[in-house]
Curated annotation (Swiss-Prot):
The gene is pduJ. This is Bacterial microcompartment shell protein PduJ. Its main location: other. SUPFAM superfamilies: CcmK-like. Residues 4-88 form the BMC domain. It comes from Salmonella typhimurium (strain LT2 / SGSC1412 / ATCC 700720). Changing K25A: Produces amorphous bodies instead of BMCs. Reduces crystallographic problems that result from edge-to-edge aggregation of BMC hexamers. Homohexamer with a central pore of about 5.7 Angstroms in diameter. Interacts with PduP, which targets PduP to the BMC. Belongs to the bacterial microcompartments protein family. Keywords: Bacterial microcompartment, Transport. GO terms for cellular component: propanediol degradation polyhedral organelle. It comes from the Bacteria. Artificial BMCs can be made in E.coli by expressing pduA-pduB/B'-pduT-pduU-pduN-pduJ-pduK (in this order). Enzymes can be targeted to the BMC, and appear to be encapsulated within it. One of the major shell proteins of the bacterial microcompartment (BMC) dedicated to 1,2-propanediol (1,2-PD) degradation. The isolated BMC shell component protein ratio for J:A:B':B:K:T:U is approximately 15:10:7:6:1:1:2. At least one of PduA or PduJ is required for BMC assembly; it must be encoded as the first gene in the pdu operon. Required for structural integrity of BMCs and to mitigate propionaldehyde toxicity, probably joins facets responsible for BMC closure. Edge residues (particularly Lys-25) are important for function and assembly of the BMC. The 1,2-propanediol (1,2-PD) degradation bacterial microcompartment (BMC) concentrates low levels of 1,2-PD catabolic enzymes, concentrates volatile reaction intermediates thus enhancing pathway flux and keeps the level of toxic, mutagenic propionaldehyde low. It is found in: Bacterial microcompartment.
Amino acid sequence: MNNALGLVETKGLVGAIEAADAMVKSANVQLVGYEKIGSGLVTVMVRGDVGAVKAAVDAGSAAASVVGEVKSCHVIPRPHSDVEAILPKSA
């Protein structure tokens, strides 16, 4: 696992796609995947160095808020290796 995990949660798929696009374009991060939470909520996840993930989450959150609603965003620096078990298998 890389040094950080970044998450942006949006209301609707369009905002999630916009966030994912902005995140990977704005910083050197890898797209981990997305999760449909329910009630229209979608969470997009990226990995990379702490600084890159922070920049990506900021960019993704800003981009998603233009086309939709951002519910939450968070960066987990140095997540525990057990977190790997709950990430999408494509990671």
